[in-house]
């Protein structure tokens, strides 16, 4: 498929994902408005409203922030056209009527291969695709083949560009650029005590914050 066609297809998926996220928030807003209308005690009603309010806030969409930053094509051994495709992003976005997710939360177990798979250990993945964005607009993609016969690829230019982007203002997340050894730390079991060491600017604080986000998710 020509690159322009691929970009068009991926932009369509991004638009569909944003529409689905809006639908999720609208449904939550309706539930929030109806909370307490069917009776029940005041404490239960207030707890429900607080839960729904937090979910409404969590479902707010910032059009300048990409909903997803990567894609995994899981090898089903039935041909590339029948691969299971999974988009990896900062939050879970459900399909219509709770069907297959349009975007999988980066903290979910199914997203682990995005960070750890390689040609020597593909973890069932045929293709890993990274996306480049500019102010929320999908502008580029980069494919890394991991299936049978694949060889270790050169370093990703999109990944390098994101890692080397100047750090200004508040600390930004690193979910699109987490490295395999960092991912192991982020997803370590709750019972494990970790000591993360490194020189200034090597990402110690970012790893710690993303580990906290992972533990809250799990």
Regions inferred by a protein language model and the residue ranges of each:
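Walker A/P-loop NTP-binding motif
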Residues: 208-218
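Pre-Walker A (Motif I) flank of P-loop NTPase domains
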Residues: 190-194
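Hydrophobic anchor at the beta1->P-loop junction of P-loop NTPases
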Residues: 196-198
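Extended, charged low-complexity regulatory segments
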Residues: 1-175, 179-187
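Conserved lysine of the Walker
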Residues: 204-205
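Walker A (P-loop) phosphate-binding loop of P-loop NTPases
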Residues: 201
């Amino acid at each position: 498929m020509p690159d322009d066609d691929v970009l068009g297809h991926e932009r369509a998926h991004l638009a569909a994902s944003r529409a689905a996220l809006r639908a999720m928030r609208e449904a939550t807003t309706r539930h929030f408005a109806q909370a307490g209308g069917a009776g029940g005690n005041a404490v239960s009603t207030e707890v429900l409203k607080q839960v729904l309010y937090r979910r409404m806030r969590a479902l707010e969409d910032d059009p300048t922030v990409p909903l997803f930053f990567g894609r995994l094509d899981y090898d089903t051994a039935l041909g590339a056209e029948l691969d299971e495709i999974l988009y990896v992003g900062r939050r879970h976005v459900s399909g219509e009527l709770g069907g297959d997710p349009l975007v999988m939360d980066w903290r979910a177990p199914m997203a682990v291969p995005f960070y750890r798979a390689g040609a020597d250990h593909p973890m069932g993945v045929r293709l890993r695709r990274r996306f480049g964005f500019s102010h929320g607009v999908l502008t580029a993609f980069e494919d890394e083949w991991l299936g049978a016969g694949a060889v270790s690829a050169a370093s990703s230019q999109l990944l390098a560009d994101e890692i080397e982007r100047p750090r200004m203002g508040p600390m930004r997340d690193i979910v699109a650029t987490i490295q395999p050894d960092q991912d192991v730390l982020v997803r370590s079991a709750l019972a494990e005590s970790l000591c993360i060491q490194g020189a200034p600017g090597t990402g110690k604080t970012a790893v710690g914050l993303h580990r906290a986000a992972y533990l809250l998710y799990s």
